[in-house]
Design a protein with these regions (language model features):
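Contiguous interface-forming segments/domains that mediate binding rather than catalysis
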Residues: 1-188
Length: 188
């Protein structure tokens, strides 16, 4: 009987941590950040003590017009998205961003660089919009299996990230389970 008791005591702390690894928002962060341990650790902190995380990142939240009156789920959603932006796994462009700014933001994404995806200015028309430019990238990167996806943050900006096409359905479902939205950037 002593064997089982000591084994249970050893497994106790691991079992307590397990739900944090299976939370839909952490799974989203894991996929988008390519399993980056530093980002996952920060995302866990955001979710474990949202109010403390909010206070530490007060300037970022206030820039988005958010306060502690917003729901914890919304604060966690935005906190994790800002974390991905800060670490260049996502980028944010205003709805009226010029082509040069869009191209710079997308080409600076870590996963675009990691996968050596080409971006040529000649593919785009400057008078078009971000959803149209993202549709062009989706077509150009189709053979490589990547698309431009986006987080809906209920604003007039686009928060985009490179997504393996085969992960998009899972990310969409995970976001929906939290009451939020991820979709192809061209659909935003």
């Amino acid at each position: 009987m002593g064997f089982f008791k000591s084994r249970q005591e050893k497994e106790g702390p691991e079992l307590q941590e397990e739900p944090h690894y299976h939370h839909p928002l952490l799974e989203i962060v894991r996929i988008v950040s390519s399993n980056n341990p530093e980002i996952l650790d920060s995302a866990r902190k955001c979710m474990k003590n949202t109010e403390k995380y909010y206070q530490y990142h007060l300037e970022d939240y206030e820039a988005r017009g958010m306060s502690l009156k917003d729901s914890p789920a919304s604060l966690q959603w935005i906190g994790c998205i800002d974390l991905l932006i800060h670490h260049q796994f996502a980028c944010e462009c205003d709805w009226c961003e010029e082509l040069s700014g869009f191209l710079l933001a997308v080409s600076d994404l870590k996963n675009v660089k990691r996968h050596s995806l080409d971006i040529e200015e000649s593919w785009f028309q400057p008078r078009e919009s971000i959803p149209q430019w993202c549709e062009i990238l989706d077509k150009k990167w189709e053979k490589a299996g990547y698309v431009m996806a986006a987080f809906d943050i209920d604003s007039d900006s686009y928060v985009m990230f490179l997504c393996q096409k085969n992960f998009l359905k899972k990310l969409t479902a995970l976001a929906e389970s939290l009451g939020f939205r991820i979709d192809l950037a061209m659909n935003m």
